[in-house]
Amino acid sequence: MNTASPIEPASNPKVEHNTRAFLKMLNSAEGPPLEELSPKEARDAFVNLQTSAPQDLPPANIEHKTVEQDGLTVDLTIVRPIGVKEAGPAFLFFHTGGFMLGDFPTNERFVRDLASDSGFTSIFVNYSRSPEAKYPTAINEAYAATRWQRMGTRSTWTGNAWP
């Protein structure tokens, strides 16, 4: 039987030092858990949490795009690393937050890091959040964005024909 105690991530020396500092700050936060807050209070707390740590944003070209697919209108934020052309590898990014929390500003650093480190274009899906949007709106928008991106990969990828 293994009797070793798990190491708390905020104290684990194998966890990157900035991440440990962030986790320690998170663990020391006072107040009720997010799930006990109203949607507005939870969103405000999430924004405050994300903006409480300093952020070095990798340079990127940012484009906001609204697309129509399968009868739905979906807002996208396209993050292209500097030097990356329009045609090329791309990935879709669906943020977490239980379809209620999060948006591009609260995920921008992470999305830019992924795009910069991979050299790929990120297509951030700004799906409608609950409770304002009823189930399954966000899932349908995510699927429509996926189909839009997939259809774009079949295009000629010339001129303005970019997914």
PLM region spans:
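A glycine/proline-hinged amphipathic helix-loop "lid/cap" segment
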Residues: 1-81
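Short helix-loop-beta connector
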Residues: 85-86, 157-159
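Short beta-strand element of the alpha/beta-hydrolase
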Residues: 87-97
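Short amphipathic alpha-helix adjacent to the substrate-entry channel of hydrolases
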Residues: 105-125, 140
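Short beta-to-alpha linker loops that shape the active-site pocket of alpha/beta-hydrolase fold enzymes
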Residues: 126-130
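Alpha/beta-hydrolase active-site loop
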Residues: 133-155, 161-163
